[in-house]
Amino acid sequence: MHNTFTHTKNNTHTKNNTQAKNSGSQTKSNAVSLNKPRKLTEADVTPESIFYQRRKVLQALGITAATLALPASAQADLLAWFKGNEPPKAPSGKPLTFTPSAAYHPDLALTPEDKVTGYNNFYEFGLDKADPAANAGTLKTEDWQIKIDGDVVKPMTLDMDYLMKCFPLEERIYRLRCVEAWSMVVPWIGFELGKLLKLAEPTSNARYVAFQTLYAPDQMPGQKNRFIGGGLDYPYVEGLRLDEAMHPLAFMVVGVYGKTLPPQNGAPLRLMTPWKYGFKSIKSIVHIRLTRDQPPTTWNLSAPNEYGFYANVNPHVDHPRWSQATERVIGSGGILDVKRQPTLLFNGYAEQVASLYRGLDLRKNF
């Protein structure tokens, strides 16, 4: 027997009785030639299933019969999306009190704030990079709660007020590397994921941590309409091994650039694992579950030959349709101001995390 604790906004606790994974080395393989990558097209950098979903939408809008064949609700969603009907504007972020960390790349040049908040992948709000900023104002973050359960001694439900008071916030400047071969440098504000998990006291059976994004089709148009959401199965889910989740680099983010997270960046709570491709850093988290078995993850379910469970940044293991040897740096310039740089193993965090994968073939376990 154990207890379930519910933390509410006034920090009262309601108790109810219930039943309740030195430098590592990857497996040696043939050397990989880091040839200059070919120029990428939209079809290259967009996941194949999403590219064809987008094409279908455009064709449907250009062919009346195809549009009329859609259900009435789908017609309305699509027409509203392309007519430019503006959703509610997202509220401005609130200033946060935090301590800047000197241990995490204070010397790196930051990506401009407008690029961090305006160039995003969050398919729940549309497929284009500008869609999340344009459409995420519908996301309601008031009274947000995070449920932690599974193989834990103390399952619990926590609200954001409690989390913000429970853990001292720090600012960490992390590299962000998207699987689409572009990168940013972002000043995230939050606390270590491991500290949160320790509250729930994982049992000896716990080997993995599963995460789930909010499922709210009335707020997230991509969940309501498969064309807008790229044909993915929602809610979005992700997972880590427990030792990855407990690593000090694994960070729960509540803010960016000194303020609370904007909706398009995953408000009010998201994950950041800087040594992995960006799709692992799940946004708008409502559920964390510790489990003995490896949990399913959205992109691996959608295209298992393209997106693995581990998703560690690795310049020697290409995506099936493009090179991962270099990355496009998102900076202050426009589309013609393109800077590329070599991609670093584990996104530059090899010294910290390589030991997690000692003996693991990173080509097979991509």
Curated annotation (Swiss-Prot):
EC number(s) per entry: 1.8.5.-
Compositionally skewed regions (Polar residues) per UniProt: 23-33
Post-translational modification: Predicted to be exported by the Tat system. The position of the signal peptide cleavage has not been experimentally proven.
Region (Disordered): 1-40
Positions bound to Mo-molybdopterin: 120, 123-124, 178, 213, 265, 270, 281-283
Keyword Kinase: no
Swiss-Prot/TrEMBL cofactor(s): Mo-molybdopterin
Residue spans of biased composition, Low complexity class: 1-22
Subcellular location: Periplasm
Cofactor note (record): Binds 1 Mo-molybdopterin (Mo-MPT) cofactor per subunit.
Top class in the EC scheme: oxidoreductase
GO cellular component, as recorded: periplasmic space
One GO MF term attached to the UniProt entry: molybdopterin cofactor binding
Span of the signal peptide: 1-76
Chief location of this protein within or outside the cell: periplasm
Catalysed reactions listed for this entry: L-methionyl-[protein] + a quinone + H2O = L-methionyl-(S)-S-oxide-[protein] + a quinol; L-methionyl-[protein] + a quinone + H2O = L-methionyl-(R)-S-oxide-[protein] + a quinol
Biological processes per GO annotation: protein repair
Subunit structure: Heterodimer of a catalytic subunit (MsrP) and a heme-binding subunit (MsrQ).
Free-text function comment from the UniProt entry: Part of the MsrPQ system that repairs oxidized periplasmic proteins containing methionine sulfoxide residues (Met-O), using respiratory chain electrons. Thus protects these proteins from oxidative-stress damage caused by reactive species of oxygen and chlorine generated by the host defense mechanisms. MsrPQ is essential for the maintenance of envelope integrity under bleach stress, rescuing a wide series of structurally unrelated periplasmic proteins from methionine oxidation.
Family per record: Belongs to the MsrP family.
The protein's name in its UniProt record: Protein-methionine-sulfoxide reductase catalytic subunit MsrP
